[in-house]
Amino acid sequence: MLEERRLEVLRAIVEDFVLSNEPVGSKTLAERHALGVSPATVRNDMSALEEEGYITQPHTSAGRIPTDKGYRLFVDRLSGVKPLSRAERRAIQSFLEGAVDLDDVVRRSVRLLAQLTRQVAVVQYPSLSSSSVRHIEIVTLNPNRLLLVLITDTGRVEQRVVDIPTPVDDGVVGELRGLLNGSLRGRRVVDATEVAADLPETVRPDLRPHLTTLTTVVLEALLERQEERVALAGTANLTRSSVDFADSLRFILEALEEQVVLLKLIGSARETGTVTVRIGRETDVDALRSTSVIATGYGLGPAVLGGMGVVGPMRMDYPGTMAAVRAVAKYVGELLGAD
């Protein structure tokens, strides 16, 4: 394990390089930071850090820059995530509370995360597996066509137009609505699917064909894998850091167009409140080896509904970015859990 002073030197190198994008020299470090030692001692510490692979010397400079390994140690030794200001927290809460439905929550979340971090933001649509059915509404469009609206406790709204076998009046529609809500309301999705499949066999024969059609549509909505969708924002932010990517920017943009890559980056964040950081090759995506990915899960309490995070250069403000990701995830979880 590195001694504490060398860790402080590494921390100072990372912080200065993130701010300036210029290789950092020992004299500059000694002048800018209260390290309590001479430039010569700092120079010796930097030599030791370089030998152990935490920093490296670009060909064109006498200064040093962090390596993947150096960034990793810096992140692992963070004493805490930098808290957002009260104004920032209030702005996040106000912006997200303006959402009108679940799709709007996702759209606002991904835009907000991109703006706060100035990186590429990715938000996974929530999984229904931990959700419950809040209400099912049926509206008559004409005697042979109904509109079915399924609402979950996380705010997801699914609408389906349903053609039924024979004409129905408002009284029958009311009965069908009552049967569906009486059987499914409040049930977790994983339980509701089984109940819905068996429901038509429990009603009188004249309602059975209509209820069979409706429960088939309900099952399709409940079983749809919404969590395989992601929202993306802020790809233009990568151009601000194009110098960090050398010749790899095009490959990064191409990788971010692949849904499976995005899901791989953030879908593994399976805990709320815990922020994960993957640096360089830790992303396991060759095109993203010059990036870092910061992600967390969001949801209702400990139940994770999805993941969110950002993709940016390794030279990023890790404490600030981690704080923003955690804060947005926290407020999204609270919003989805609100009645």
Swiss-Prot record:
Disulfide bonds: none annotated. The keyword Repressor applies. It holds the Pfam family HTH_DeoR. One of its GO terms (molecular function) is DNA binding. Keywords: Repressor, Stress response, Transcription, Transcription regulation. Signal peptide: none annotated. The keyword Transmembrane does not apply. It comes from the Bacteria. GO terms for biological process: negative regulation of DNA-templated transcription. NCBIfam families: hrcA (TIGR00331). Negative regulator of class I heat shock genes (grpE-dnaK-dnaJ and groELS operons). Prevents heat-shock induction of these operons. Belongs to the HrcA family. This is Heat-inducible transcription repressor HrcA.
